[in-house]
Amino acid sequence: MKLEREHVVDEIIGDVKTNKFKIGEDSMGIIIDSLINLYSDPIGSIVREVTSNCYDAHREKDLKVAGTIPITDEDDPKWFHPTSKKPQIEFQEENVLLGVGNAFLFRDFGVGLSKKRVEEIYTLFGNSTKRDDNNQIGGFGIGAKSPFSYTDTFYIMSKHNGKTFSYMLYRGNDAFHMDLLTEGVTTELNSTEVIIPLDEKESYRDIKRFIKAINNQLMYFEDLQFINVEEGGGRKLKKATIDYEDQDLLIDLSQQHEYNVKEVHLIVGRVRYPLNHSMFEDGLWERDEIPCGIKFDVGELDLVPSR
């Protein structure tokens, strides 16, 4: 998502001593904590942000194959999956490899996560590869770290150009860390997995909360594959049935009848956002008339990071 930056001062005339604001090393953890805790709905934000990153990884791969954006020296198309391979969300009742119990796994088959990208992009708060165009959803540089708003530890497994990497991301006493656990070779094509262990004490409740977030956040996402989410989670997933759609509006009557969703809402790209009706004059519309989504392209609205 291309971010619009406001320029307040374009030029300083005269001999003026300028001091740039900095972040003290000892305060880095506090600042990062503040960024992570921006999200008003942590689980909903995790589902939205990590799934959007999965789609962005596929989009980046497809744009590079098409020649729309340049291939870098880290890219080797022979390791790319075909476009028919779609992002996945999986519920795992146990991950023996990592030694964790219930977990949600988000898997993409995009360009893969190289060691260089980990060092230069993934571990830097505010860094993003998505700010120069509106071809991808992200752009703030904090969405990949959104799992920290729910858990102190999560994992990433990456396959990139014939190599495998597994990482543990965790919150330390004074900073956040991403440690390389294992490195090996593989014949499998590129992919990235984000594994979020559930709180052991609240696992049953949080399974339901994650599935509710999937239903609320991702109902308009297309070509998304679910593995053991309904079966393992014990709750039905919503499937949008589009009754009407044009360039501005989308109507899905099944939301009203099956899920009691009646509000007018926003759709940015394919992400569903609630609309704050209190900001509008009374009587502007009957909010309980019909479940209608107002559509916007990525980059058309200025979204806040706390969304």
Listing of model-derived features with the role each one plays in the protein:
Residues 50, 54-58:
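Short helix-loop "hinge" at the ATP-lid/N-box region of the Bergerat-fold HATPase_c
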Residues 35-42, 110, 135, 142:
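Conserved aromatic-histidine-acidic binding/catalytic patches
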Residues 22-49:
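Conserved short strand/loop->alpha-helix "switch" segment adjacent to the catalytic nucleotide/phosphoryl-transfer site
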Residues 132-152:
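Glycine-rich phosphate-binding loop
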Residues 44, 48, 141-144, 148, ...:
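Amphipathic alpha-helical transducer elements in NTP-driven molecular machines
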Residues 153-157:
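Glycine-rich ATP-binding loops of the HATPase_c
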Residues 1-25, 57-137, 162-307:
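Interdomain "switch/hinge" adjacent to the Bergerat
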Residues 34-35, 142-144, 182-183, 283:
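Generic recognition of flexible, low-complexity loop/linker segments
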